[in-house]
Protein backbone atom coordinates (compact mmCIF):
# COMPACT_ATOMS: atom_id res chain seq x y z
CA UNK A 1 0.00 0.00 0.00
CA UNK A 2 1.36 3.42 -0.96
CA UNK A 3 0.05 6.90 -0.27
CA UNK A 4 1.28 10.46 0.13
CA UNK A 5 1.48 12.59 3.24
CA UNK A 6 1.84 16.35 3.06
CA UNK A 7 3.62 17.71 6.13
CA UNK A 8 3.46 21.18 7.66
CA UNK A 9 5.13 22.79 10.67
CA UNK A 10 1.78 24.14 11.84
CA UNK A 11 -1.34 22.19 12.79
CA UNK A 12 -3.51 25.08 11.63
CA UNK A 13 -1.89 24.96 8.16
CA UNK A 14 -2.46 21.19 8.09
CA UNK A 15 -6.16 21.70 8.77
CA UNK A 16 -6.40 24.61 6.31
CA UNK A 17 -4.78 22.54 3.54
CA UNK A 18 -7.07 19.59 4.28
CA UNK A 19 -10.09 21.91 4.01
CA UNK A 20 -8.70 23.44 0.81
CA UNK A 21 -8.30 20.00 -0.82
CA UNK A 22 -11.73 18.86 0.34
CA UNK A 23 -13.38 22.02 -0.97
CA UNK A 24 -11.75 21.33 -4.34
CA UNK A 25 -13.06 17.77 -4.55
CA UNK A 26 -10.01 15.75 -3.50
CA UNK A 27 -10.46 13.00 -0.92
CA UNK A 28 -8.00 13.63 1.91
CA UNK A 29 -7.55 12.66 5.54
CA UNK A 30 -5.74 14.20 8.49
CA UNK A 31 -3.38 11.57 9.92
CA UNK A 32 -0.51 11.36 12.36
CA UNK A 33 2.75 12.13 10.59
CA UNK A 34 4.71 8.88 10.38
CA UNK A 35 7.49 9.08 12.96
CA UNK A 36 9.92 7.81 10.34
CA UNK A 37 9.52 11.15 8.52
CA UNK A 38 10.89 12.97 11.57
CA UNK A 39 9.30 16.29 10.64
CA UNK A 40 6.41 18.58 11.32
CA UNK A 41 3.79 19.26 13.92
CA UNK A 42 2.64 15.66 14.26
CA UNK A 43 -0.28 15.89 11.82
CA UNK A 44 -0.20 15.57 8.04
CA UNK A 45 -2.66 15.41 5.18
CA UNK A 46 -2.92 11.98 3.56
CA UNK A 47 -3.86 11.74 -0.12
CA UNK A 48 -3.77 9.07 -2.80
CA UNK A 49 -0.48 8.48 -4.61
CA UNK A 50 -2.40 9.17 -7.83
CA UNK A 51 -3.14 12.71 -6.59
CA UNK A 52 0.46 13.96 -6.68
CA UNK A 53 0.07 16.44 -9.55
CA UNK A 54 -3.20 17.85 -8.15
CA UNK A 55 -1.61 18.12 -4.69
CA UNK A 56 1.43 19.99 -6.05
CA UNK A 57 -0.83 22.43 -7.93
CA UNK A 58 -2.92 22.91 -4.80
CA UNK A 59 0.23 23.67 -2.78
CA UNK A 60 1.26 26.34 -5.30
CA UNK A 61 -2.15 28.02 -4.97
CA UNK A 62 -2.43 27.49 -1.21
CA UNK A 63 -0.07 30.36 -0.52
CA UNK A 64 2.39 31.11 2.23
CA UNK A 65 2.37 28.36 4.80
CA UNK A 66 4.56 26.20 6.97
CA UNK A 67 4.78 23.52 4.27
CA UNK A 68 7.66 21.06 4.82
CA UNK A 69 7.31 18.48 2.08
CA UNK A 70 5.47 15.64 0.39
CA UNK A 71 6.40 12.11 1.40
CA UNK A 72 5.63 8.78 -0.23
CA UNK A 73 4.70 6.21 2.40
CA UNK A 74 5.04 2.54 1.49
CA UNK A 75 3.95 -0.19 3.87
CA UNK A 76 5.94 -3.40 3.44
CA UNK A 77 5.55 -6.33 5.84
CA UNK A 78 4.06 -4.02 8.47
CA UNK A 79 6.91 -1.49 8.26
CA UNK A 80 6.57 2.03 6.89
CA UNK A 81 9.16 3.23 4.41
CA UNK A 82 9.18 7.01 3.89
CA UNK A 83 10.67 8.82 0.90
CA UNK A 84 10.68 12.54 0.19
CA UNK A 85 9.31 13.32 -3.26
Report the location of each language-model feature:
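Amphipathic, hydrophobic secondary-structure cores in small proteins
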Residues: 2-5, 9-11, 17-18, 22, ...
Amino acid sequence: MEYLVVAFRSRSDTVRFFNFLSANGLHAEIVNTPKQAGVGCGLSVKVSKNSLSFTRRALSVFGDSSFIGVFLVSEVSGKKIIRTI
